[in-house]
């Protein structure tokens, strides 16, 4: 999550969340003009005929008034399901996974002490998802705590503290070194939220992070489409990736190829502690454990990616929905059914 319903409750009716949604809630934003774009880009290879499972998954996604993509891979057998899996998407908070991995790699290398405490200053507070902004400045969480909050509650304050500590360019160098060419962290949360104000007046580029925090978000309840234009402009995305790349990134994490065994276990635990369970785990969460990371700007964006710990072995799933014009509950329900479709199909054919 980046933006939450707490913001809407404060009169910021145009925003919601860059993380996910366990509290089956949604907010309303002005729908984008025109239908979602789902066509295969010119020059792309003709996709193979879909399997029955792929056809089912695609039908569910295509029923949504949104740009969508999906990728699933059974780590044990290597079988895959993909629907527009190579289409670049606005990740919103899903990209925080890369920040987490770099933090643990730095810990493994001795560059970061996870037990070290960081005193949160007023200028480090960020609006949107998370709980740290609700506390009085001066709180001193450990870096391990900050990572946990960045993933489990998609805390934006924790995210920017970690980006400042690790270095944004280093996140992208890590992704480059792992051959994830479409996956990028584009900016800080502070710059992302400042950009909303810059749309209204270029002079707002001079606002400090604390001034942006104190202002909150502009009211778009009159339906001007302010937030729609913002989140669909690819130059202003917080993060960028494809369903395939994020799925393979999660596979590498689960296989222990991104960090030490101890760090891998801590990252797995952080994903399992995710508090927003209304998408991928919605219909399968009582059957299997799902370690996942959501990403939202409701109701226009609702993403969920994760590792499904099925009895026969782990399955990675990545679902992106951008430019959604329908209610969030329908989007959440569709992704929940897609996850159930994949789990059911592969559980009976192992």
Residue ranges and their predicted role:
Residues 17-20:
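C-terminal motif of bacterial Sec signal peptides marking the signal peptidase cleavage site
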Residues 47, 82-90, 130-137, 145-149, ...:
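Second-shell loop/turn segments in exported
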Residues 105-148:
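Active-site-proximal loop and beta-strand segments within enzyme catalytic domains
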